[in-house]
Amino acid sequence: EVKLSGDARMGVMYNGDDWNFSSRSRVLFTMSGTTDSGLEFGASFKAHESVGAETGEDGTVFLSGAFGKIEMGDALGASEALFGDLYEVGYTDLDDRGGNDIPYLTGDERLTAEDNPVLLYTYSAGAFSVAASMSDGKVGETSEDDAQEMAVAAAYTFGNYTVGLGYEKIDSPDTALMADMEQLELAAIAKFGATNVKAYYADGELDRDFARAVFDLTPVAAAATAVDHKAYGLSVDSTFGATTVGGYVQVLDIDTIDDVTYYGLGASYDLGGGASIVGGIADNDLPNSDMVADLGVKFKF
């Protein structure tokens, strides 16, 4: 079975200097089937990513059953698969100021080559959920070494509360001027009526030049060097009838380099039928960084 769905948006964006029109439309192909023994399988990709879907760069393919779910392609890393990101602000996500994305190392947030498919396994039994993900450590379908990523995560849900722990690691090839990286994540998610709260704390080591790029600093590139870092954040959103209001704040602190605080606030109004009015503002405390904002209409088909 093949189904078509999609989304679209139109509105205005403020980039810190000027207002610009902004619009987008996308079509999603979703394919699914079931074997005689009851195994479910399928795939999905966006129309504009059809070329990348042929090589696993974009889109995903899955097989699921009583053993869990196996997914390959542009899949999430284990931690993100269980914990997700902070509340998304604005109809364009406003991620050019840091955004709501938790700084995971692996999966579709990965620092490895974009044409390197990820394998993700997830399994749930009662209140427990586990996930594991990895790449094959090669560039595309070649024998050229690439960074090898691995991640594991587990979560426990009791009532309206979820707590979880994740670990991610990237092993760089010997020929690369990039240090090995790793990160441990703690996450907590809660629901109080119509209000959702999510918090996380992450601690580990980043490649020095990757860390410097976050602050628009010139790479050193003299040798592969790791620096300690930590990150933490909180988001809250609440729904009142057709209106949802939410925001986030998160901090990235890198030893010997700098620290930055990202924050955003937004609201949406559900018009019904798959349409909504959405707007938001976002900023950070980096030098020469101005507030960005957007306001527009989003559609789901």
Swiss-Prot record:
One of its GO terms (cellular component) is cell outer membrane. Pfam families: Porin_4. InterPro entries: Gram_neg_porin_domain, Porin_dom_sf. It comes from the Bacteria. GO terms for biological process: monoatomic ion transport. Keywords: Cell outer membrane, Ion transport, Membrane, Porin, Transmembrane, Transmembrane beta strand, Transport. It is a multi-pass membrane protein. It is found in: Cell outer membrane. The monomer consists of a 16-stranded antiparallel beta-pleated sheet barrel (171 residues), three short alpha-helices (18 residues) and 13 hydrogen-bonded reverse turns (26 residues). Forms channels that allow the passive diffusion of small hydrophilic solutes up to an exclusion limit of about 0.6 kDa. This is Porin. It comes from Rhodobacter capsulatus (Rhodopseudomonas capsulata).
